[in-house]
Amino acid sequence: MRYVEYGKENNNIILLLHGGGLSWWNYEEAAKSLQKDYHIILPILDGHAESDKPFTSIEDNAIEIIEFIDTHFEGSVLLMSGLSLGGQVLLEILSQRNDICKYAIIESALVKPSKLTHAMIKPAFGSCYGLIKYKWFSKLQFKSLKIRSDLFEFYFRDTCAISKKDMIAFLQANSLYSLKESIKNCTAKVHVFVGSEENAAMQESAVSIHHALRESLLQVLPKWHHGEFSINHGEDYANKVREIIGD
């Protein structure tokens, strides 16, 4: 697994896990804001642009990150955060290692498996994968994701770099992930965020995560869509990180 880093001179470690189909730039604005006081690490999940290996599973990504933290930071960091697929990887990390971080942020992570969605992914991408290399098609996708316009070139470049096999693999993994029983043993102070404009499954997932983590805090973000908090409002996100750590 590869990593992008900011603020290497600082001792307190914050690790941020990007969403599926995106990359480290998901958190670039927040990372640049936080780098004065924290060492920010942005892993590039397997199977994504600039990654060093194909995607296998959410569990394997979690193991890689745990091993990285064990090797470089004596088994724990200050805060970890994850959006969507990255949020699922973080939930898996917290399930496997309950004390790996002091604080955690879960943003829009799906934990309501859908066999129907899983079954539809392969035929859907089999017919339209080739279109992602056309800007007109990519712009339609990008617009539907509600990502701020200045990130389009990053999005287009990186989606074109993801193989069909990897894209199907991580989308299928995303559609089937569910919480592990061991998540209840997590000792981190967890904050769960979801946009009010997200679909019902995502809203229900946020509630399920909140209930599974008894000491967690759940916040519904008014008028925001999937991933808008960390992607489109990086400075607000950075301020929330500071607020959480300050608690």
Summary of predicted features, one role per range:
Residues 6-50:
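Conserved HGGG/HGGXW glycine-rich cap/lid loop of the alpha/beta-hydrolase fold
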Residues 41-81:
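Active-site loop/oxyanion-hole signature of alpha/beta-hydrolase fold enzymes
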Residues 82-86, 90:
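Gly/Ala-rich beta-loop-alpha elbow adjacent to hydrolase catalytic centers
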Residues 95, 101-131:
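Flexible "cap/lid" loop of the alpha/beta hydrolase fold
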Residues 115-117, 131-184:
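Conserved alpha/beta-hydrolase catalytic His-Asp/Glu region
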Residues 186, 192-194:
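Short beta-strand/loop motif that positions the catalytic acidic residue
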Residues 199-205:
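Conserved alpha/beta-hydrolase "acid-adjacent" motif
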Residues 224-235:
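Catalytic histidine-centered segment of alpha/beta-hydrolase-like enzymes
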